Amino acid sequence: VDAHARNLVLFDIDGTLLRTEGVGVAAMLRAFSRLHGERGFSFEGVEIAGALDGLLFARMMAQHGLPADEATHAEFQKIYADELARALTPSVVRRMPGTVELVGALRDAGAAVGLLTGNYEHTAHLKITVAGFDRTHFPFGAFGADGPSRRHLTPVALERAAAYLGRAFDPARVTIIGDTPHDIDCAKAHGCRALGVGTGPYSPERLLAAGADLAVANLADLPGMRGWILG
């Protein structure tokens, strides 16, 4: 990555770069049961899309009157990573159209590329690796245990990008790409550009209504996406 990169691009993972079709959620529920025994753990009525893993953990613990201290959280993350690693095979991970090509094209053009995701760091890297992305193409990011809400993750990602590249980025040159209104919100709250993608549960129209600067069905139009992001 060019240390003089003018553009920073931060990708969400689930519903944006790839889909695991429920495997991640199932692995998380098994991890709760391994940690605390069968208690009927369920995400029924909980909006998973755009949620932070750390927040889902805290919510589940509170719901069942269980401790959510740091040691328990660390143990849960280990068990969840183990469950996910066993369940996640290339056959259950679907890469979204044009994503690998876009990441490569942005890097080739000298843009800095990172992650901004609700996934824990370890499981984020696990998902993108199994999906066939080069993990080294995302050398920094903000993850699901880095703050209490997605809006808190944006400054973390910007700080880590600055630390990695040795310079700060103008938020107007930062594009956050995601598939939920939470992704749009965490961009706009910090003066960044928001690119909504309809490969998750929300249509491009819904993402535009949430404040996206641009919303598309998918990222397959490589010249169009590259031009808009770097423009």
Describe every region a protein language model picked out.
Residues D2-A49, L55-A58, A62-Q63:
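Active-site neighborhood of HAD-like aspartate-dependent phosphohydrolases
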Residues A5, L10, A85-L115:
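Short, acidic loop-to-helix structural element flanking the phosphoryl-transfer center
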Residues E44, H73-A74, R135-S149:
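A short, structured active-site edge motif that brings together acidic residues
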Residues T99-A131, G141-P148:
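Substrate-recognition element of Asp-dependent hydrolases with the DxDx(T/V) motif
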Residues A142, L214-L219:
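Short acidic-hydrophobic, aromatic-tinged amphipathic segments that line or gate anion-handling sites
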Residues L153-I184:
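Conserved Lys-Pro-Asp/Glu-containing loop-to-beta segment of HAD-superfamily phosphomonoesterases
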Residues I176-L214:
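Acidic, Mg2+-coordinating phosphoryl-transfer loop and its flanking beta/alpha structural elements
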Residues L222-G231:
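Short amphipathic alpha-helix with an adjacent loop that forms part of the alpha/beta core around
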